[in-house]
Amino acid sequence: MTELARTRDADGRIVVAGGGVAALSSALLLAQTGREVVLIDPAPPSASGEDPSTSCVAQIMHPHGILSQGLAMLSEHLPAVLGRLLKVGGTMVNLLEGDGPPVDTVLMERWMLDAALRAETAQARAVRILADSRLTDVTAAGQMACAHVRGRLGGSTTLTARCVIDATGTHRRTWSAEFTTIREHHGSPRDFHSVRYKLMPGARVPPLSRVVTGRVTLPDDTEASIIRGPRDTFHAVVACSRHWPMRRHLRDPAFHASFFRAVPGLGAWTLPESSTPMSSVLSFASMGNHWIAVSEHVTAVVRAGDALFTTNPAHGRGISHALTQSLMLARALGHSEDIHTGIATYRHEVHKHLRPWFDDSVLLDDTTPKGVAHRARLAHVRKLAAGDPLLNRMTVERHHLLRDSTLPPPTTS
């Protein structure tokens, strides 16, 4: 049993809305503390997560990785989830391959983690699941919150709770205007076009510049990358400006294949004798960097996952951020006699430990002329980090040599 197993105020119901990593892991961890949890899940009751075609997650087939911080959290607090993840195909690798202490990560496709989390959530006694349902409104009722829920096939209900955790993703919420203050929005002017491949047995391909990734910068602000996945799969990714004249042609599988095969040092990975394509072109626009905050006067609603903040997915931090937030929620809300004090603690911890990663993502993306003004405004981040180990950790992160899981989360205070 972990420290989360302590029970405090077990009769305080918490409603968690969402069907992604942040929602499922938060429900599991809060249940460990003895809280009564109601999960409003948009997926149907039959959804196991193992059929990617039934998922509403746009990037369900894209390569993902769980970085060291998220992996340490799973190992300690949700080992059964990690075990299931590895069983369905997640692959553990050491990013440094012997150069210094091991830095482990799990390569996976998103559906693998969803399947592992769903299987464990379905078995959690303290989690009541309202499947095939969506959160349609939240209203305040003194120190309580009322979550209004509607099923996809009709019918509705209202749940009164000590706290509502909104982990419903990035979509717009007309009901949340009175709760939400959008702190920052930094769009990313880049598109990503990816094709999933399977390596042929015995294929001889050139080594990548890093253990699981290789990247080549091309003219016209375009990049080509190979990203290794589980079970001898990889993705060939082209990132380009949304203003690049050839962008629309990358959605054509034949054009994407011919374009990538001409990339120096990486094209050989996609030759017919090396690999077989396993998907059409998977295209998506970067979500950019969004930081969304719940107004201070709201004491019964919090956000988690992409509903709270997003960073450019090219930096590969989203899954670990979601897992970290769920642990912060469980520690703050599960171990507080006064749940509203716990909410304040959670908000403080998120801003202290995760805000620096958001700022760093903005700085990494801050290369356009429009970004000059951002650099001046965010100069304080560099100044605060100047004498702090955070600067070194972020330098390592920039080079994809991910933080050792024994380090504490970064902070600028």
Protein language model annotation of sequence segments:
Residues A31-Q59:
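Glycine-rich FAD pyrophosphate-binding loop
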Residues A330-S413:
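C-terminal helical "tail/cap" subdomain of flavin- and related membrane-associated enzymes
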Residues L4-A22, V38:
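Beta1/beta-strand and adjacent pyrophosphate-binding region of the FAD-binding site
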Residues L29, P45, I60, H64-V88:
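Conserved FAD-binding subdomain of flavin-dependent enzymes
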Residues G65-I66, G100-A119, R173:
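Short beta-strand to alpha-helix junction loop
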Residues A72-R110:
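A conserved beta-strand/loop capping segment in the N-terminal third of enzymes
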Residues P230-D232, W244-E349:
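FAD/FMN-dependent oxidoreductases across multiple families
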Residues Q123-H256:
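Predominantly flavin-linked oxidoreductase catalytic cores and closely associated redox partners
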